[in-house]
Amino acid sequence: MSAIEKLFPTSPQERSFQMKARRDAGTAAPNWVPPQFVECKKCGRRATRQVWVKSQYVCPNCGVHLAIGAYYRLSTVLDHGTFKELNPDIAPNDVLHFPDYQEKLAAASVKTGLKEAAVTAIGRIGGVQAVVAVLDSRFFMGSMSTAVGEKITRAIEYAADKHLPLIIFSASGGARMQEGIFSLMQMAKTSAALERFNRSGGLYISVLTHPTTGGVTASFASLGDITLAEPGALIGFAGPRVIEQTIEIGRASCR
């Protein structure tokens, strides 16, 4: 243990959280080596990962917000040392025995270090205690499964029970097709929980990040008392590709 760690001891959960945040940011790599340079997907600017971490993955050239991992986002939002994860053991369930779903879940978990696309936590922001939920687009495109719906619902209910403000960072491609109707049911489940939270006088801040679409947009992402969004984020019910395939018109024809 270093001299600094002796002066400012941290809990095992906090150390685990910081390790996960560094992994998400690309500054710690236990099993893989991240690229030395990261390129902005909008303007093409290339910079070292350290430069991007300092700017919290906001392009200094064009201002676009790059996607970031759930634990890294929580580390940038919550006061140091106040993170406590809620319901970390909730994991997806292959209720329909969908072909290759278990294998894809395992691969996504290895790639991201996550059990599911949502991470929920309690912590302080500027000294104010709050419940924060983050969807991570790296895990099944942040799609809403029964496990994601359960974690979001429990976070809402925890905020209501403790009379705490609630903040949800959304990033999703919609409902998870591998779970069929069970995934779609989460739209009503989370919306009903938010209605009860609203009636109890709770404050809900919804933050829409790129992209937020489908069933998440049609449920809890659109129900905030205050709604914020990243500049240039894709927000809608259907993405461009789905619209193009439905009406059989390319993007170029619409301009």
Locate the predicted segments by residue.
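N-terminal alpha-helical interaction blocks
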Residues: 1-28
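N-terminal targeting/trafficking signals and adjacent low-complexity tails
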Residues: 30-33
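Residues immediately within or flanking Cys/His clusters that coordinate Zn2+
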Residues: 37, 56
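Short cysteine-rich clusters marking metal-coordination/redox-active sites
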Residues: 40-43, 59-62
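Cys/His-rich microdomains that often coordinate metals
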Residues: 46-47, 65-66
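Long, charge-rich boundary regions
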Residues: 68-142
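Cleft-lining beta-strand/loop regions that shape enzyme active-site pockets
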Residues: 119-198, 205
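Conserved catalytic cores of soluble enzyme domains
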Residues: 170-255
